[in-house]
Amino acid sequence: MEHQQQQLRNLRDFLLVYNRMTELCFQRCVPSLHHRALDAEEEACLHSCAGKLIHSNHRLMAAYVHLMPALVQRRMADYEAASAVPGVPAEQPRDSPSGS
């Protein structure tokens, strides 16, 4: 069930990015709706705009993937430090008797 929810979140995130990209490029590249088809200039602008946004997205995702292990490690260290009981070492489970 959790896997399906994660897939739905991923799909939702993808669609939000796609819709935002489409809206941004359309507003930038299509100044009027006087013709049914895109003219060559509009088509070139849309191609360039979408390409730039996709390239930017890939670079951001690569940076995220590169930084994620360090972020997870830092969060785990913060969590362990916050949950440690004073006077009890972090390696020792809290519910075990001390001094054994």
From Swiss-Prot:
Protein name: Mitochondrial import inner membrane translocase subunit Tim10 B
Topology term for the membrane: Peripheral membrane protein
Record-linked InterPro entries: Mito_inner_translocase_sub, Tim10-like, Tim10-like_dom_sf
Cysteine-cysteine disulfides: C25-C49, C29-C45
Pfam families on file: zf-Tim10_DDP (PF02953)
Source organism: Rattus norvegicus
Keyword Hydrolase attached: no
Keyword Transport: yes
Gene: Timm10b
Domain notes for this protein: The twin CX3C motif contains 4 conserved Cys residues that form 2 disulfide bonds in the mitochondrial intermembrane space. However, during the transit of TIMM10B from cytoplasm into mitochondrion, the Cys residues probably coordinate zinc, thereby preventing folding and allowing its transfer across mitochondrial outer membrane.
